[in-house]
């Protein structure tokens, strides 16, 4: 018996109707909170190298990255290139009421959307600008240092001088024992971030595309002295 189709309606007894019903039920069970939005797709098409990925981070990646942060107590956290804010929302959800989250976003559309998302949260500060402004933004808010700095920006496309300058500012902005956490398609930054005393990486497959998650750690005690190093000579504990 042929299926009766009229105005795109499918007869309830048709096998096609049963199939679409199953698909609808399966779709309803999927968490779409981390899927690509229209805004994300448009910005990727306009700035593919800046956005770096065609889809936002998966829920699994977001949770894995957040697991690298100790949320017990007030924390100061900065994020470079939050995009749609999938990591930002998870961090804000977990951090205490006395914590601060500074979001540095170059893209005006993303920045405006982040301000809308966190309009009622005084802990979250959205900065439309370069991550290199971190020292000034901390000083402006009378914050001494960050406990954690998170980044998903594609460091591989930055010129070497800009890359090293941002790494130096990141290192200086961290408290002793603080961590710089990155998630990247490649792990090339590890060979440049020799200013950090310790680094550990993992290859995370539950994301499209798979990502390297690397945690760079600043030494717990440095006797209060600034540490500028010869980039090509500084040792780093490289654990895969």
Features from the language model and the residues they span:
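Class I SAM-dependent methyltransferase Rossmann-like catalytic core
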Residues: 39-69
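Conserved class I S-adenosyl-L-methionine
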Residues: 74-83
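Glycine-rich SAM-binding Motif I of class I
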Residues: 85-89
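Conserved SAM/SAH-binding beta-strand->alpha-helix loop
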Residues: 107
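S-adenosyl-L-methionine
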Residues: 111-140
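A short glycine-rich, Lys/Arg-flanked "PGG" loop and its adjoining helix->strand segment in the class I
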Residues: 164-176
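Conserved beta-strand signature within the Rossmann-like core of class I S-adenosyl-L-methionine
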Residues: 177-184
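Core SAM-dependent methyltransferase catalytic element
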Residues: 203-240
């Amino acid at each position: 018996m042929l299926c009766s189709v009229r105005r795109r309606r499918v007869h309830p007894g048709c096998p096609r109707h049963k199939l679409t019903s199953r698909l609808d039920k399966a779709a309803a069970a999927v968490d779409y909170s981390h899927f690509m939005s229209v805004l994300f797709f448009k910005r990727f098409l306009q700035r593919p190298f800046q956005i770096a990925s065609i889809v936002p981070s998966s829920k699994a990646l977001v949770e894995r990255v957040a697991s690298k942060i100790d949320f017990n107590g007030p924390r100061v956290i900065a994020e470079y290139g939050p995009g749609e804010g999938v990591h930002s929302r998870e961090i804000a959800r977990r951090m205490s009421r006395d914590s601060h989250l500074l979001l540095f976003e170059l893209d005006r559309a993303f920045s405006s959307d982040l301000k809308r998302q966190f309009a009622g949260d005084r802990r979250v500060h959205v900065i439309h600008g370069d991550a290199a402004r971190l020292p000034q933004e901390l000083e402006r808010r009378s914050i001494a240092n960050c406990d954690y700095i998170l980044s998903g920006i594609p460091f591989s496309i930055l010129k070497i001088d800009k890359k090293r300058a941002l790494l130096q500012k990141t290192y200086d902005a961290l408290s002793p024992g603080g961590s710089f956490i990155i998630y990247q398609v490649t792990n090339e930054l590890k060979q440049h971030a020799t200013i950090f005393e310790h680094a550990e990486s993992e290859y995370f497959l539950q994301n499209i595309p798979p990502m390297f998650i690397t945690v760079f750690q600043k030494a717990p005690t440095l006797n209060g002295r600034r540490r500028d190093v010869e980039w090509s000579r500084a040792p780093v504990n490289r654990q895969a």
